[in-house]
Each structure stands twice: as structure tokens, then as C-alpha cells.
């Protein structure tokens, strides 16, 4: 059976769809293609369970110099290509389907459409949400495989394969010593409630370096905080480095998602706020200390790895001290 999975959300949601992709492909009865957006596509790039990966550019994800018309023409070509594929089934991989996904269904016109949410004439298999509440997003998305009677009854590990050439280049550029553990501090977060301040990251780095022979890799979203399209944390990274002049910290300015994935693949543990980077670490099998502000750990905790969630009662990560996070690090990552 030819199956198209449409997952057009962010990095974390896309990675949390990979157990469903794996279960369908590894059943031996289905060819699985995936449609996503250019922003999330790199996390699926080398996935062996995907026959064909299609992606389009959202208008607000256009690169500098990429015109709106060119973007729309590219999307039209993709629509025509998908229509020719003659899929048997389309799965809308979202906890509740939306109109954006349905637009692609109208183009593809499969025999069956599987989705979660409210009824629609185009949706042939409308599934109820999993009965367990609260439910992890990976379990919610995996429930979309119920009509296929898969042998797996629960989602397995996430799948993410780094680009080996990029990883090798970063290993050389950053002078990574393979005999010494590398721990990643990922300092960026989209939500203000999940943005742990620079001084606390510096304090954490001091504590880790004082107690463990290690290399510390500092990772962040590139760009200035004032960039209106893609705000980054260049200033925060510089502040942390200035506070830790004598520590074994390697500031790795990853300018693309494949670079971030490759950099994390060189590490043996991760401290990060909830978000796409946290799920990348989990998908690579790293033990994770996850800082949660105003989001629900029951739905979004790192999947199928050793992890510890820290969420203060205020739901503001800056209520956490560097000592609290270090204790979680020592318990979760170095033991």
C-alpha cells in the first residue's frame, strides 16, 4: 500500500512522527512517503524508512532573495508531482487536523484519509484521540496507525541520522578529543518562559567542568536577538563565553539544522529547554536534562531516553538555579 504522511509542523512534532513512520515501513506491507516543510525536512533527510521525502517552503520560511512567486510556483510543481503518485492512503500527522493539511489532501485525492479531530467529508478514517490523558505527542501520532493493524502497539524510539561528513568536519574543526566526554548546553528557546539566562548557564558550566573531566559544547540558534525574521542568541553565547574564559567550552555556531544535528551527534549528554533541539538530542539517543517552563512535560518530555525534567512551580525556567540543574545533570547524564 502506498502511504503519504503529511507532517508540516515544527522539528519536535516531525521527529515524534518517526515511530509511526518506522512501524509502517518495517511492517513490509507499506511504502511510506512523507511531505513536510523545508524547515523540518533535515530531521527526516537520511531516514531509511522513508521512500521519498517531499518538502515545500512556507512563505515565512523563505530565504533572503527568494521571491514569493518562485515559492508558490515550486509548491504548484510539487502538487502536480504528488497527484501523479496515486497514493492509497494519506495520514494527517497532527493531534488535530487543520485546513493547511487538508489542502494537500484535496490535491492528492487518495482513496483513504486518516486523521484525528473533527469530521470532514474528505476524512474517511476519523480516529478518536488515545484514551490515556495526558498523552505524549508521540503516542498521539502513533495512534494514527491503528487502521493498519500494526504489530507494534506503542511507539518505539525516534529515528534521526546525522550527516556523517558534516559530523566528521565538525569533529576536526572543534578539535574534539574522542577520549573525553562531550556535554552539550543548548541555550536557545522560543518561549520566554523557557529561556534560562546566560549567567545560570555559565554557573552550570563551571560546576560541570569542576567535577567532571569533559568538553562542553555550547549550542544556540544563530543570529542576533534583534533579527525580526529569525531571532537568535549570538549575544547570549558571547556573554556565556565571556563569563567562562578558562573552561573547556567549545562554542559551535551551527548555521543550519544539519550542522546542529551533526554537532549533537558528537556529544554524550544534553542540557536544553523544551523545544526542537531537545527532541533532536533524544532522537540521537542522548540522556537529557530538560528545562520546562510553560509547556506540559507529560506531552513533550524527551522520548525513549534517560531524561530528567525540571519544571518550577512558577513555570518560569529562570526560577531554577545552576545548582539544581547540575544535580539533575549529575544524576541523569554522568551516572
Predicted regions and their residues:
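Catalytic machinery of carbohydrate-active enzymes
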Residues: 1-335
Amino acid at each position: 500500500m502506498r502511504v503519504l504522511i503529511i507532517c508540516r509542523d515544527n522539528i519536535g512534532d516531525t521527529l515524534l512522527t518517526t515511530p509511526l513512520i518506522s512501524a509502517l515501513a518495517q511492517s513490509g506491507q507499506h511504502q511510506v512517503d512523507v511531505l513536510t516543510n523545508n524547515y523540518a525536512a533535515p530531521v527526516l533527510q537520511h531516514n531509511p524508512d522513508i521512500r521519498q521525502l517531499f518538502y515545500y517552503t512556507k512563505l515565512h520560511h523563505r530565504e533572503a532573495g527568494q521571491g514569493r512567486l518562485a515559492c508558490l510556483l515550486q509548491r504548484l510543481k510539487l502538487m502536480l508531482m504528488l497527484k501523479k503518485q496515486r497514493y492509497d492512503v494519506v495520514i494527517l500527522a497532527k493531534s488535530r487536523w487543520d485546513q493547511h493539511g487538508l489542502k494537500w489532501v484535496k490535491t492528492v485525492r487518495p482513496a483513504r484519509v486518516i486523521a484525528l479531530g473533527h469530521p470532514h467529508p474528505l476524512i474517511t478514517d476519523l480516529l478518536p484521540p488515545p484514551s490515556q490523558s495526558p498523552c505524549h505527542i508521540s503516542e498521539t501520532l502513533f495512534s494514527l496507525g491503528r487502521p493498519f493493524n500494526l504489530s507494534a502497539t506503542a511507539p518505539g524510539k525516534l529515528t534521526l541520522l546525522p550527516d556523517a561528513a558534516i559530523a566528521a568536519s565538525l569533529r576536526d574543526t572543534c578539535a574534539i578529543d574522542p577520549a573525553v566526554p562531550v556535554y552539550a548546553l543548548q541555550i536557545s528557546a522560543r518561549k520566554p518562559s523557557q529561556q534560562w539566562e546566560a549567567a545560570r548557564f555559565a554557573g552550570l558550566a563551571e560546576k560541570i567542568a569542576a567535577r567532571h573531566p569533559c568538553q562542553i559544547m555550547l549550542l544556540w540558534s544563530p543570529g542576533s536577538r534583534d533579527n525580526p525574521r529569525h531571532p537568535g542568541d549570538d549575544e547570549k553565547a558571547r556573554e556565556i563565553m565571556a563569563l567562562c574564559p578558562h573552561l573547556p567550552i567549545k562554542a559551535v555556531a551551527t548555521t543550519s539544522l544539519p550542522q546542529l544535528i551533526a554537532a549533537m551527534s558528537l556529544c554524550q549528554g544534553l542540557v536544553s529547554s523544551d523545544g526542537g533541539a531537545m527532541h533532536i538530542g533524544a532522537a540521537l539517543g542522548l540522556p537529557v536534562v530538560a528545562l520546562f517552563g510553560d509547556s506540559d512535560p507529560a506531552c513533550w518530555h524527551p522520548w525513549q531516553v534517560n531524561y530528567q525534567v525540571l519544571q518550577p512551580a512558577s513555570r518560569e525556567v529562570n526560577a531554577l538555579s545552576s545548582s539544581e540543574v547540575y544535580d539533575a545533570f549529575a544524576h541523569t547524564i554522568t551516572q
